[in-house]
Amino acid sequence: MLDKLGSNINNALSKIKNATFVDKKLVKEVIKDIQKALIQADVNVKLVFAMSKEIERKAIYESAPKGLSKKDHIIKIVYDELVKLLGEEGQKLELDPKNKNIILLVGIQGSGKTTSAAKLARTLQKRGFKPALIAADVYRPAAYQQLKQLSEKIHIPLHGDPTKTKTPMEITEEGLKQFKKNDVIIIDTAGRHKEESGLLEEMKEMKEKFNPEEIILVIDGTLGQQAKNQAKAFKDAVENIGSILITKMDGSAKGGGALSAVAEIGAPIKFIGTGEKVDDLEPFDPKKFISRLLGMGDLDSLLEKTEDIIDDDTEESLDAMMRGKFTLNELYSQLEAISKMGSMKQLMAMIPGMGTNLPKGAADITEHKLKKYKIIMDSMTSTEKENPDIIKTSRMKRIAKGAGVKQEEIKELLKYYSTTKNAFQNMKSGKMLKMGGPMGKIMRQLMYKE
């Protein structure tokens, strides 16, 4: 997974950070470690060695700028070269809110195209657009039902043919007529093809018929550097209106390979899928991506995620925690925030210094566990939530019966509470929590509450 890549690169850089003296031998040793980490992530060997030469040349022969130590200069060189590897500048999906924007989503079978259609609709909905979805994939049995469930969840209109008696062209034509008042129409095209040639032929037909503003190729991140072939064929076929969305970046050891392979041929990567939830789609920005990978954080994305969640309850709980109070009530509020904002691991990766330093277990909570923990806490008394230390065997039996769980699961919750409390106390003394103004407030809020 990508967190392993980030951890491996950070372990290499820590040799620089912790060294009393940085010489040529140490630089070469660190570069070898970085090479190994990238190759394990399925980044093309030629790209890795070309990047390594640049790092070595600059680290050994360049003088550090004024105000920057030799160590920091080398770390910045590594950061800059990794950003170059992924294309340097992020590219946004530009749409005209005054006109109807048609977006075609195409992809090989199993790429995650249908889920990505809903995620993209949700992303554009949050940007103020009025998107609609057209389910034109009539070949995969569950495609329509899947998109229907997702669209209902995010309250976005959908047109499709559950009977599967119409062609993709007919469904799309009907949908475009139906959604005259919507400014973005996302078409989930037929994903019947297992090879690029068939997919590109279908895409060409749809392009000629419906004249889309954007065609997005959905690529499975687990392909690693093999993604290059799909991206190149696509780029050559669509000229200047195509972009790439890479899925499964949260669970693929080859995600870095897929990103670098696509960036190598100059195909614009505009989005990456970072999880299973409908909100787990992010605009791709190489600088932000590498910042998170190296534990430097991503404050811009952090602010975006916190924009809509600061309310009175959040403020009250935040104030309590900043006074040193962290009970199960505060944990409950935190878990509710996670369900709104994404996984704790993703959120912590946006905080400088936290992506790679989070205590083991502090971010290890699945959606299933989150719901179960909340049920357990709902079965506790106010006194128990305020004073978790009093929860012994007899109380556990009563709580377990009320929540319909095993006592072991209550112990697991209490252990998670203890780990999270320790993480909070460790970070409470950090600079992030001492920041003033709106930024400091949001940073504190995001880390420990809502």
Curated annotation (Swiss-Prot):
GO terms under biological process: SRP-dependent cotranslational protein targeting to membrane
Entry keyword RNA-binding: yes
UniProt source species: Methanococcus aeolicus (strain ATCC BAA-1280 / DSM 17508 / OCM 812 / Nankai-3)
Protein name: Signal recognition particle 54 kDa protein
UniProt entry tagged with the keyword RNA-binding: yes
UniProt similarity note: Belongs to the GTP-binding SRP family. SRP54 subfamily.
UniProt catalytic activity: GTP + H2O = GDP + phosphate + H(+)
Molecular function terms, GO-annotated: 7S RNA binding; ATP hydrolysis activity; GTP binding; GTPase activity
InterPro entries cross-referenced by the UniProt entry: AAA+_ATPase (IPR003593), P-loop_NTPase (IPR027417), Signal_recog_part_SRP54_M_sf (IPR036891), Signal_recog_particl_SRP54_hlx (IPR013822), Signal_recog_particle_SRP54_M (IPR004125), SRP/SRP_N (IPR036225), SRP54 (IPR022941), SRP54_GTPase_dom (IPR000897)
Residues noted as binding GTP in the record, renumbered to the chain: 107-114, 188-192, 247-250
UniProt domain comment: Composed of three domains: the N-terminal N domain, which is responsible for interactions with the ribosome, the central G domain, which binds GTP, and the C-terminal M domain, which binds the RNA and the signal sequence of the RNC.
Subcellular localization: Cytoplasm
Listed PANTHER family: SIGNAL RECOGNITION PARTICLE 54K PROTEIN SRP54, SIGNAL RECOGNITION PARTICLE SUBUNIT SRP54
Enzyme Commission (EC) number: 3.6.5.4
Function according to Swiss-Prot or TrEMBL: Involved in targeting and insertion of nascent membrane proteins into the cytoplasmic membrane. Binds to the hydrophobic signal sequence of the ribosome-nascent chain (RNC) as it emerges from the ribosomes. The SRP-RNC complex is then targeted to the cytoplasmic membrane where it interacts with the SRP receptor FtsY.
Sorted UniProt keywords: Cytoplasm, GTP-binding, Hydrolase, Nucleotide-binding, Ribonucleoprotein, RNA-binding, Signal recognition particle
Subunit structure: Part of the signal recognition particle protein translocation system, which is composed of SRP and FtsY. Archaeal SRP consists of a 7S RNA molecule of 300 nucleotides and two protein subunits: SRP54 and SRP19.
GO CC entries: signal recognition particle
